[in-house]
Amino acid sequence: VYDSSVYLMQRDRDTDDIYISYSTPKTPSRTFVYNLKTKEKKLVKEQLIPSGHNSNEYIVERLECEGHDGRIIPITITRKKTTKLDGNSNLLLYGYGSYGNSMWPSFSSIRLSLINRDIIWATAHIRGGMERGMKWWKEGKLLNKKNTFQDYISCAKFLIDKKYTSKKKIIGMGGSAGGLLMGAVVNEKPDLFLGMIMAVPFVDSLTTNLDHSLPLTIGEFDEFGNAKENKDHFKYIYSYAPYNNIKKMDYPNILI
């Protein structure tokens, strides 16, 4: 897992020029033209931040924590240099961990608004993504899906132990399959978080998986399994599906 994102945007076959986009969590997107023959590069476009932005005021860190089964999970941290690491800072922990989608480090003006208010932004590169290759994905899908949830919990506990934040000062955030992650985690560790942000969350995952008439269900079999035709898949999905595992207990604040 790297601390920047670089994309080849375009190559004109009639010239030696290629266009490259570059950004980091603290550096707005920049587009360069690079000449393959002369090895020269030129900045041709830069993302404008109307309120102003100085990348030197921020820190991007790559941390690693040990998961429940010994696997090492990367975490990307973006924060202001002046934010204190004494356990009193608010922290937003973002997670997804499905379909082999990797959460690459890139710039976001939306995140910047929070970071400028001394909120630490953390991204957990948990299994189910492919930040560490195909095996990283396979270890977070089908009958290994709970690794995704446990990895996220391990990241939250690690950040608390290292004084980046503390219990009741940490917010979880994820959307769609990341909303499934938030739902499963909050059912297991409700006392660990101040709140959860679930964007279009996939929380009634068992009912959805059982209904093959829905347009997206069959396409989900490779990721989550086929609960209708496989008893092991049914039992496993039932054991973590957020809607089926709601308990009579105090939950943190939840925004859907």
Where are these regions (language model features)?
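Structural motif
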Residues: 26-33
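Short flexible coil/turn linkers enriched for glycine and charged/polar residues
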Residues: 14, 25-26, 69-72, 179
